[in-house]
């Protein structure tokens, strides 16, 4: 992972989602509790 993606404690930075992205994530979660990494990335780029 890129150095700017981690916080001071070495953990990955929290992703901030827009309202639209949050709604999409909630819809996906309703049907499938375990989103694939690929699907999370697709929603993040929406």
UniProtKB/Swiss-Prot annotation:
Keyword Cell membrane: no
Cellular localization per UniProt: Nucleus
A GO BP annotation: anterior/posterior pattern specification
Segments of the chain annotated as binding DNA: 10-46
Top-level division of the source organism's lineage: Eukaryota
Main location: nucleus
Keyword Repeat: no
Transmembrane regions: none
Keywords: Developmental protein, DNA-binding, Homeobox, Nucleus, Transcription, Transcription regulation
A Pfam short name: Homeodomain
Molecular functions per Gene Ontology: DNA-binding transcription factor activity, RNA polymerase II-specific; RNA polymerase II cis-regulatory region sequence-specific DNA binding
GO cellular component: nucleus
Cited function: Sequence-specific transcription factor which is part of a developmental regulatory system that provides cells with specific positional identities on the anterior-posterior axis.
Similarity comment: family membership: Belongs to the Antp homeobox family.
Official protein name in the record: Homeobox protein Hox-B5
Gene designation per UniProt: HOXB5
